[in-house]
C-alpha cells in the first residue's frame, strides 16, 4: 500500500514539474508508510531542507487528493546507505582509539597545494544573485561544493553568454576549498586543455599530462563546446572523464548550449555529459535584473534608486554582463559630470545602447523569429486559425512581445491583427503557467529569448 501511494505521488509530481526539477530534487527520494505516517527520506540534509521548503505543500495536496481526510502525516528524514553507515562506524572507531592517547603530534599540517587552481576568489555563492532563472543551477552548484564527487557528477551547466556560468564554476571551486583541506582543484577554459594536450604530445609527455589531469579532486572546464571538431582532444578527454568518474572525482562543465545540441562533439561524450545533472541558466527575469543592478551599485558605493534600476533592467534583458557594462558606464559618466543618477541621466548616458535595443527587438522581429522556430508562416500567427500548431506559437509570440518590448498589451494585440488586450493577457498567463508545468515549453521560451537577445 505504501509503495503504491508513494508511486502515485511520484507520478503526479513528475507530470506537474519540469523534468530537470523532478530529476534534481524528487527522483532520489525514498518513502515508507507506517502507522499513517509517510516518512520521506532524502539522501542528504541539503536536499531534505530544499524539498521540505519547496515541495511540502505539493505533497500535502497530492495526499489529500488521494486519501481525503485520511491523509497520512508527513515526516522528512535523511537516509544513509550501508556504505555511508560503514564509513561513519569506522570514523567513530578511529576517534575512540585516538582518545586513549595524546594526539597533538599526529595532527597533519596542511600545506598550500603547489598547483595553480586558477579559481577566482571574487566569485562566491554569497555574491551570486539568485532568481527564478538560475535557482536550480545555484542550488545544484552549492550541493556539489558541499559534497564533491557524490552529488550530481558530472554537473553540466548551460546557457547563453554572460548569464553566470563561469561565476558558478568559481563559486563551486571556492566552496570546495572552504569545506575541504588540501584538495586539488583545476579551473580552466576548454581551449587550455587542448593547448596542454598539444604541448604534451610535442614534448613526448602525454603520460605526465594524463597523470596531472586524472589526479585532481575536481575538474572545472568552461565552454566545453570548443572541443568541437578536435578529435584528438575529445579522445583524451573521454578517457580522462572516465578515469575521474571511476575515482569519484568531481567534474563540472559549462556550455552555451544543451549537450545534445553541441555539434562536432562525439555522441559518446555528449552522452556522458548527461550522466549526472544537466541544468539550464536562463536570461534573468526583471526582478533578478533589478536586484543585480542594485547589488553591483552597492559594491561601488553607489545608491541606485529602484526607479533607475527598473528602467535599466526593463531595457537591457539579454545577460548579466550587459547589465554590469551599462551600469559601469552610468557610474563613470556620473562621476565625471558630477550629476545625480536619475532616469533622464541614464537615458542620456545609455542612449546608443537603448536605441540599439529598440531597433533590434521589435514585435515584427519576434513574430518572424517565432514563426521560423515553429516552422510556420508569420501569416499563420496573424490569422484567426485556432489549431494548437498555430495557437501555441501565437501565444508564445505575444508573451515574447510583452517580455522583450515596451509595448502595451493593446499595442501588442494590434500587431496581431487587432486582437483585444485581454487575449494578449491570457496568452502571457498561459505561457507563464506552461513554463512551470511543461519542460518543452520552458525550453522553447528560453531558446527564443536567447535568439532574440543576441
UniProtKB/Swiss-Prot annotation:
Residues 118-334 are annotated as: Domain III, AAA+ region. Residues 1-79 are annotated as: Domain I, interacts with DnaA modulators. Residues 79-117 are annotated as: Domain II. Residues 335-454 are annotated as: Domain IV, binds dsDNA. Keywords: ATP-binding, Cytoplasm, DNA replication, DNA-binding, Lipid-binding, Nucleotide-binding. It comes from the Bacteria. ATP binds at residues 162, 164-166. InterPro entries: AAA+_ATPase, Chromosome_initiator_DnaA, Chromosome_initiator_DnaA-like, Chromosome_initiator_DnaA_CS, DnaA_C, DnaA_dom, DnaA_N_dom, DnaA_N_sf. SUPFAM superfamilies: P-loop containing nucleoside triphosphate hydrolases, TrpR-like. GO terms for molecular function: ATP binding; ATP hydrolysis activity; DNA replication origin binding; lipid binding. It is found in: Cytoplasm. Belongs to the DnaA family. PANTHER family: CHROMOSOMAL REPLICATION INITIATOR PROTEIN DNAA. Oligomerizes as a right-handed, spiral filament on DNA at oriC. Plays an essential role in the initiation and regulation of chromosomal replication. ATP-DnaA binds to the origin of replication (oriC) to initiate formation of the DNA replication initiation complex once per cell cycle. Binds the DnaA box (a 9 base pair repeat at the origin) and separates the double-stranded (ds)DNA. Forms a right-handed helical filament on oriC DNA; dsDNA binds to the exterior of the filament while single-stranded (ss)DNA is stabiized in the filament's interior. Domain I is involved in oligomerization and binding regulators, domain II is flexibile and of varying length in different bacteria, domain III forms the AAA+ region, while domain IV binds dsDNA. NCBIfam families: DnaA (TIGR00362). This is Chromosomal replication initiator protein DnaA. It comes from Buchnera aphidicola subsp. Schizaphis graminum (strain Sg).
Amino acid at each position: 500500500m505504501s509503495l503504491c501511494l508513494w508511486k502515485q505521488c511520484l507520478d503526479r509530481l513528475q507530470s506537474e514539474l519540469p523534468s530537470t526539477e523532478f530529476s534534481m530534487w524528487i527522483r532520489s527520494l525514498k518513502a515508507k508508510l507506517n502507522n499513517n505516517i509517510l516518512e520521506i527520506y532524502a539522501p542528504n540534509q541539503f536536499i531534505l531542507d530544499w524539498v521540505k521548503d519547496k515541495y511540502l505543500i505539493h505533497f500535502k495536496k497530492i495526499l489529500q487528493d488521494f486519501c481525503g481526510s485520511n491523509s497520512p502525516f508527513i515526516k522528512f528524514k535523511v537516509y544513509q546507505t550501508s556504505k555511508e553507515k560503514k564509513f561513519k562506524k569506522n570514523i567513530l572507531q578511529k576517534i575512540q582509539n585516538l582518545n586513549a592517547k595524546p594526539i597533538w603530534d599526529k595532527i597533519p599540517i596542511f600545506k598550500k597545494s603547489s598547483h595553480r587552481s586558477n579559481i577566482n576568489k571574487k566569485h562566491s555563492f554569497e555574491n551570486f544573485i539568485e532568481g527564478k532563472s538560475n535557482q536550480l543551477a545555484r542550488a545544484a552548484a552549492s550541493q556539489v561544493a558541499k559534497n564533491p564527487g557524490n552529488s550530481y557528477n558530472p554537473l553540466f551547466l548551460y546557457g547563453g553568454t554572460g548569464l553566470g556560468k563561469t561565476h558558478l564554476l568559481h563559486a563551486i571551486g571556492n566552496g570546495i576549498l572552504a569545506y575541504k583541506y588540501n584538495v586539488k582543484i583545476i579551473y580552466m577554459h576548454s581551449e587550455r586543455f587542448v593547448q596542454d594536450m598539444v604541448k604534451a604530445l610535442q614534448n613526448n609527455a602525454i603520460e605526465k599530462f594524463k597523470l596531472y589531469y586524472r589526479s585532481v579532486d575536481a575538474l572545472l572546464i568552461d565552454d566545453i563546446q570548443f572541443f568541437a571538431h578536435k578529435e584528438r582532444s575529445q579522445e583524451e578527454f573521454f578517457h580522462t572523464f572516465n578515469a575521474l568518474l571511476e575515482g569519484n572525482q568531481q567534474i563540472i562543465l559549462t556550455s552555451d548550449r544543451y549537450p545534445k545540441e553541441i555539434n562536432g562533439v562525439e555522441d559518446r561524450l555528449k552522452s556522458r555529459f548527461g550522466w549526472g545533472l544537466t541544468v539550464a541558466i536562463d536570461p534573468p527575469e526583471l526582478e533578478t535584473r533589478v536586484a543585480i543592478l542594485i547589488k553591483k551599485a552597492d559594491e561601488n558605493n553607489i545608491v541606485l534608486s529602484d526607479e533607475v534600476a527598473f528602467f535599466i533592467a526593463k531595457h537591457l534583458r539579454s545577460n548579466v554582463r550587459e547589465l554590469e557594462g551599462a551600469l559601469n558606464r552610468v557610474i563613470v559618466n556620473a562621476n565625471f559630470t558630477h550629476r545625480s543618477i536619475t532616469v533622464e541621466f541614464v537615458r542620456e548616458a545609455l542612449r546608443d545602447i537603448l536605441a540599439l535595443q529598440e531597433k533590434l527587438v521589435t514585435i515584427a522581429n519576434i513574430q518572424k523569429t517565432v514563426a521560423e522556430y515553429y516552422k510556420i508562416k508569420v501569416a499563420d500567427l496573424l490569422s484567426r486559425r485556432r489549431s494548437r500548431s498555430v495557437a501555441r506559437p501565437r501565444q508564445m509570440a505575444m508573451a515574447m512581445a510583452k517580455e522583450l518590448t515596451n509595448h502595451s498589451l493593446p499595442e501588442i494585440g494590434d500587431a496581431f491583427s487587432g486582437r483585444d488586450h485581454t487575449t494578449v493577457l491570457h496568452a502571457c498567463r498561459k505561457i507563464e503557467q506552461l513554463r512551470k508545468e511543461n519542460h518543452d515549453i520552458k525550453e522553447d521560451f528560453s531558446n527564443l529569448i536567447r535568439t532574440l537577445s543576441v
